[in-house]
Amino acid sequence: MKRLCIPIVETTMGKALIAIKEVNRLADLIELRADYLRGAKLALLLENRQKPFIVTNRSKEEGGKYKGEERKRLSFLQEAIDLGADYIDVELATERSSLQGLIRNKRGTQVILSFHDFRRTPSPKELQRLFGQMIRLGADVIKIVPFAKSWEDNLNILSLIPFAKARRQKIVAFCMGEKGKISRIFSPSLGAAWTYASLNQSRASAPGQLTVRELTDIWKTMR
C-alpha cells in the first residue's frame, strides 16, 4: 500500500490552515514543518487535521529552518505530545538525555527518529548500524534519508526496507537529490511506511522532492 505524506511549509498561521485543508484531501499523512512557521498555534492546527499528523521542528543542522534555542525547539515537540499529535519527528543527533526524555514521555504519540545526510549515502553496513542504534533508543518509526550521489545509492537505501520489514520495524527510507528521486517513488512499493511529496514545486521541503501530482501520475503508470 502506497502512503503519501505532504509537508506543510507555510510561514503564517493563515496560510498553514488553508494548506491543511487542501492536504487533508490529498494525503494519507500531514507533516507540519514548524521550523518554517512563525507564531505556531499548535492546538488550532491539530484541531483542523483529518489525517494522521506529524509535528517536525527541524534543526538547521539537518536541513531545517529553526535557529532558536534547542531547549525551545524540543519543548515544542513535547507540547505536540501533550496535545495528542499522532507523531513527532526528532533527529537522532539530538542530545541524548533530551531525546530519551521525549521518547519516555511520548504517551500516545509515536516517535519518528530521523537521520539525514546531505553529503552522501552510507554503505549498507553503516545503514544497518544506524538502524540498530535507532531501534535501541526506542523509535516507533525509523527515518533514514541520505543524499544520492550515484544511482547505486538508491539500491543501498532501498535494501534497508526489507531489512526493517524482516524485523517488523516501521521505516521511512529514500534518498534526497536529483538522483534519489527513484527511491522516493519505489520505497512504498517495497514496504516503507510512507514517502513524501510537496503540494507544488515551490513548497518542496527537501532536495529532489516530487510534487503530489508528479508522484501520483508516476504511480498510476506503474499499476
Language model region names:
Residues M1-G63, E69-L74:
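Conserved N-terminal beta1-alpha1 strand-loop-helix module at the mouth
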Residues P7-V9, L29-R38, L77, A85-R96, ...:
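Catalytic beta/alpha-barrel core
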Residues K15-R25, R73-L83, R129-G138:
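Alpha/beta enzyme core
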Residues L26-D28, Q50-P52, D82-Y87, R104-L113, ...:
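Glycine-enriched alpha-helix->loop->beta-strand junction motifs that scaffold or abut catalytic
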Residues Y36-Q50, L92-G108, P122-K125, K149-A164, ...:
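Active-site-adjacent beta->alpha loops and helix N-cap segments on the catalytic face
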Residues F53-G101:
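Glycine/small-residue-rich loop that forms an oxyanion/phosphate-binding "nest" at active or ligand-binding sites
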Residues E69-L74, P124-L130, N156-S159:
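Charged helix-capping and loop-helix junction motifs
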Residues P162-R223:
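C-terminal alpha-helical cap/extension of soluble enzyme domains
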